[in-house]
Amino acid sequence: MASDSPLRAHLRLKFAESSGITRMVERDHHGPLLVQKPLYPEGYEVCQAVVIHPPGGVVAGDELGIRVHVGPSAHAQITSPGATKWYKSKGRTARQHVYLHAEAGGVLEWMPQETIFFNNARVMLHHEVELEKDSVYMSCEILCFGRTAFGESFDSGEIKQHTSIRQEGKLVWFEKLRLEGGSKAMNGRLALAGRAVCATFIMSGKPLPAQAIDLVREEAVRIGGESGQVGITQLKSLLVARFLGDSSEVARHVMLCIWRAVRPITLGRPAIVPRSWNT
C-alpha cells in the first residue's frame, strides 16, 4: 500500500492537430502523475495518452489534478494502465479534480479503467468538461464500492462526486453524488439500488438514430442484463448509458460494447480497445 503521507500531483496535457496528425504539444506534471510518451495504436490521427500514478493508490489527504486541452480537429484518447484505488481514511478526504476541454471539431475520449473505493475511503471527485462547437466527448467510468473480489463491501466512508458538461457555454449535464458507506441511500433506487458497481458511458454530439440505439441497448442488455441493470437514454445532445451490478468485469464488457457500437457511427472509425485494458 502507498505511504500515509499526503501527495499533491498535477498533470497538464495539450494536444494539437497539424496535417492530419494529432500531437501532444504540452506535457507538464508536478508530483507522481505523468504520461511517459504519446501512443498511436490506430494511426497518427488519434493520440493516446496513458496517465500513470506510480504510487498505485490514493491515500487520505492526497490531491490529484488533471487538465487536458484538445485543440481544433485534434483527437486525444486518455486512459490508465490499471484500476485507480482509493484507500481507507482515518478522517482526511482525498481529492481529484479533472478538467477537460475540447475546441471546435476536437475529439476527447476519457477512458480510465475502474475506480475502486476501499471500505472507509473518503473521496471528493470533481469532473468538468467544456466543449466547443462540433466537438465530441466520450467517457467511460466504472465505480466499484468496496473490493467485492475480496468479499469487502463499502460499509463506511463517504464518496462525493460532481460532474458537469458544458457545450458552447451551455450546461447540458450536471450530476451530484454523495454516498455514505452503509447508508440507506446506497440501497435506494436513485443511487446504487444495493449494488456495488456503477458504470456510466456518456457521449456528446449529434443524436444517434433510434434504430441504432435499440440495437446497442439490446446487445448491452444481453451482456449485462442477467447480472445487473442496463439503461440507455438519448438526450438532446448526449447519449447516457448506465450499468448497475456487482461485477466490474461485466460492467467493463457492457461499457466496451456500447463504445464499440457508437464510436464508428459518431467518429467514422472502429473502436480499438486500449492495450492497457487487456493487461
Curated annotation (Swiss-Prot):
Gene Ontology CC terms: cytoplasm
Disulfide topology: none
InterPro entries: UreD
UniProt-annotated location(s): Cytoplasm
Primary location recorded for the protein, binned into one broad class: cytoplasm
Keywords of the record: Chaperone, Cytoplasm, Nickel insertion
Coiled coil ranges: none
Record carries keyword Cytoplasm: yes
Signal peptide, first to last residue: none
Pfam families, per the entry: UreD
Complex formation: UreD, UreF and UreG form a complex that acts as a GTP-hydrolysis-dependent molecular chaperone, activating the urease apoprotein by helping to assemble the nickel containing metallocenter of UreC. The UreE protein probably delivers the nickel.
Record family assignment: Belongs to the UreD family.
Protein function: Required for maturation of urease via the functional incorporation of the urease nickel metallocenter.
The protein's name: Urease accessory protein UreD
Organism: Nitrosospira multiformis (strain ATCC 25196 / NCIMB 11849 / C 71)
Gene: ureD
